[in-house]
Amino acid sequence: MSREIALTEPLYQAKGIKKYFPVTGGVLRRKIGEVKALDGVDLDIYRGETISVIGESGCGKTTLGRMLAVLQKPTGGELSFDFGDGLKNVVGLNRTEELAFRRRVQMIFQDPYTSFNPRQRVGAAIDEVLQVHGMKDPEERFSRIKESCEMVNMRVEYLQRYPHEFSGGQRQRLAIARCLAIKPELIIADEIVSALDVSIQAQIINLLRQIQRETGLSFVFITHDVAVARYVGHRIAVMYLGSVVEILPAGALPQNAEHPYTIALLSAVPDMNLQGKKKEIVLQGEVPSPIDAPSGCAFSTRCPYVMDICKIARPVLRLAYDTDPSHQVACHLEKPPIGA
């Protein structure tokens, strides 16, 4: 289901984000290389929008989420958030500024069980977050907790239970409630429905959309499921080997996809309406190692349309050929390839 969102001034902006992890070897464990988990990611996130991030396993989706939440510091590039008076770099904030940032930006993880203390009642876990962020009045905290639980359709009496007493879907609702309790502006959701049954997935996704309508929250929704990404997102960012290769409106999939990787990725998604007519594009070769990524375009070793320039110069995100200002593609092709 496509929805439109006003793309004005970004709430959060990532420019040229890199994250390299050192590879060590030998007796002295000296650095012998680097894993380029993220290699120059540009991404704008707007108020009230959901941007879905998709790609194969190992493409850097989760690392990007952790960078945006500043759970890890980038090797290079800038992360800038609008605190109300314009964009400000969020790397290297002091303690007070960091708390102000974390009040505004929260992250939900794939496994909610590991994000709760198994020996702590869930009500106490949510209350602890409010105390950390300076809410001292117990009655005010309880009112806020009650409100957030009601938003995710969980009874207040459940707060006296322990994490193991809930189903996976209920724990994920409580993880969402914990984020909502401090009234953030942006929530980063990392594969939060991938471990749930399909029926429960639909409930959680519809819940997020309802919360967004009621609060105007922004979401970064990280997933490997293209269908889920299309349904929940206003825009979709496609990642390959640590880079964003295409950003396009969710309603533009699959017909307006331009990057060869995006087209190949979409061709592998079953479509009952095109059964027998749809041709799957099988990419040759394996995904290159992030330790020894190819020069030029990261997709050049597997792209069926590769040119000489692709092996030399790395393409940057530019306006796509459909001239939609919200559609960007990183590709040297002079015209988009014909999709499957």
Residue ranges and their predicted role:
Residues E78-A100, D137, L253:
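ABC ATPase NBD Q-loop/coupling interface
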Residues Y162-F166, Q170:
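Conserved ABC ATPase signature
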Residues D82-G86, E139-E157, L266:
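Conserved ABC ATPase "signature" region
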Residues A69:
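Helix-to-loop junction immediately C-terminal to a conserved catalytic motif
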Residues A181-E185:
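A short, proline-enriched helix->beta-strand linker immediately N-terminal to the Walker B motif
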Residues E4-P10, T24, L28-R29, L87, ...:
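Charged, flexible cofactor/metal-binding loops and thiol motifs
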Residues I192, L196, I200-K278:
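P-loop NTP-binding/switch modules centered on Walker-like glycine-rich loops
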